């Protein structure tokens, strides 16, 4: 069941990666999309594992209760903590895509097969300005994880 949740977590982070790249391309602060990336990863994990938990799955009742409150049986602590991994990998992927697009715009004659490995190897280089965005984005992912983890613990008490 966790394997399916892990797959859902990676799939749930994809819209955040796309939004991150789009916001960065229009010269907006793309790191805001990491919050969506993290919540998408948590939602993807819980969405795929929740259907397996219930043998008599009632979709209408699920839709009504999904956004009402966080209940202990709906969310697992593992999903909150594990979803940090796909989110941070998504930040790396989004920055590599942005860096590759910037290189391709500057050197249009270079093939993409050479650009992407160069971007993957040099995205952490202090010579380029991408490292600060990666640090800020990863910090936002971790802050989102901590806030969601503690808020869910607080809400589960009631």
Regions found by a protein language model. Give the residues of each.
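C-terminal binding/interaction regions
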Residues: 73, 77, 86-158
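Membrane-interface extramembranous regions at the lipid-water interface
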Residues: 1, 11, 15-16, 47-57, ...
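Canonical alpha-helical transmembrane segments
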Residues: 33-61
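Hydrophobic alpha-helical transmembrane segments
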Residues: 3-10, 32, 77-81, 134-135
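Membrane-helix interface and helix-disruption motif detector
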Residues: 20-32
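Membrane-interface segments at loop-to-transmembrane junctions
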Residues: 63-81
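Transmembrane alpha-helix boundary/anchor motif
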Residues: 18, 39-44, 144-147
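Alpha-helical transmembrane segments in multi-pass membrane proteins
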Residues: 4, 8, 12, 16, ...
């Amino acid at each position: 069941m966790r394997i399916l949740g892990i797959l859902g977590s990676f799939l749930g982070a994809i819209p955040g990666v796309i939004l991150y790249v789009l916001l960065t391309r229009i010269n907006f602060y793309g790191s805001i999309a990491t919050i969506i990336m993290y919540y998408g990863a948590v939602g993807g994990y819980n969405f795929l594992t929740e259907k397996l938990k219930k043998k008599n799955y009632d979709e209408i009742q699920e839709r009504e209760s999904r956004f009402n409150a966080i209940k202990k049986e709906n969310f697992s602590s593992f999903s909150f903590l594990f979803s940090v991994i796909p989110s941070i990998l998504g930040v790396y992927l989004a920055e590599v895509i942005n860096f590759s697009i910037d290189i391709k715009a500057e050197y249009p004659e270079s093939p993409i097969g050479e650009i992407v490995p160069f971007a993957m190897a040099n995205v952490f280089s202090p010579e380029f300005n991408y490292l600060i965005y990666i640090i800020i984005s990863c910090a936002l992912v971790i802050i989102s994880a901590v806030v969601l983890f503690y808020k869910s613990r607080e809400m589960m008490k009631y």
